[in-house]
C-alpha cells in the first residue's frame, strides 16, 4: 500500500484496521497465557534452585500465595511471548504510511528490541539481583534479625527489579524509531538531558532498595544508555536527512 492510498483511507477504515491488529494481539495473548500455565512451574522451580533462593527459606503466609505466584508468572510469560506479536502488529499498522526502505528498517527493530529486552533482564538478574539479595542478608545479619521471606514477596521483588530493566533497555530502539518518524531529534534529546537524567534517577530509586551502591548500579547504566540513545538518534537523524535530500533531488529532476 502506497502513501497515497493510505492518505485516501477513511477514518472508519483506519479504525477497522486497528481493530483487526488489536484482535490479533488479544488472541495471541490468550494462546501464550495458556502456554504460560505449562511454563510457569518449571520456571518457578528453576528460580528456586538458584544460589540466591537456596540461601533463603521461602514461606507461604497466605493459602493463596502459591497460586498468586503461579498466575503472576503465567501472565508475565503471556505478555513476554506476546510482545513480538505486539511489535509486529504495530509495525504492520504504521508501515503503509512508510516508504519501502523505511518499512525494512523499522521491521529490523523488532529483533533488536527483543535482544535489548533480554540484555536488560540478564543484567538485572545475574548482576544486580544477587548483589541486592546479598546486601539485604548482610544487613539482617548485622542487626541480628532472622529473615522470614514469603514466596510472594520474593518473586514480586525479583520481577520488580528485572522486568522494568528489560523495558528500560528498549530506550535506544524507541528513540531511534521516534527519530526516524521525525517525532524527536537528537538536538531535542540533548536539550532535555537534565530532565531525562532526573526521570531516570527517580525510576532507579523506585526499583532499588534505599542504598547508595545498588542505586548507582542501576542509575549509571541507565544514564549511559540514554547517551547511547542520543548517539544512535544522531545517526538515524543524519540518515533520514540524507534520504529526504535524495528524495528532493529526484523530485526536482522530474
Curated annotation (Swiss-Prot):
Subunit structure, as described in the record: Forms a complex with TatAy. Two types of complexes exist: one composed of TatAy and TatCy, and another composed only of TatAy.
Membrane topology: Multi-pass membrane protein
Functional note: Part of the twin-arginine translocation (Tat) system that transports large folded proteins containing a characteristic twin-arginine motif in their signal peptide across membranes. Required for YwbN secretion.
Xref: Pfam families: TatC
BP-aspect Gene Ontology terms: intracellular protein transmembrane transport; protein transport by the Tat complex
Keywords for this protein: Cell membrane, Membrane, Protein transport, Translocation, Transmembrane, Transmembrane helix, Transport
Source taxonomy: Bacteria, Bacillati, Bacillota, Bacilli, Bacillales
Further remarks about this protein from its record: B.subtilis possesses two minimal, substrate-specific, Tat translocases: TatAd-TatCd and TatAy-TatCy, each one composed of a TatA and a TatC protein. TatA is bifunctional and performs the function of both the TatA and TatB proteins of Gram-negative organisms.
GO (cellular component) term, any one: TAT protein transport complex
Protein name (database record): Sec-independent protein translocase protein TatCy
Gene encoding the protein: tatC2
Taxonomy, superkingdom: Bacteria
This protein's record includes keyword Cell membrane: yes
Similarity annotation: Belongs to the TatC family.
Cellular compartments annotated: Cell membrane
A single GO molecular function term of this UniProt record: proton motive force dependent protein transmembrane transporter activity
Record-annotated membrane-spanning stretches: 24-44, 67-87, 112-132, 157-177, 187-207, 212-232
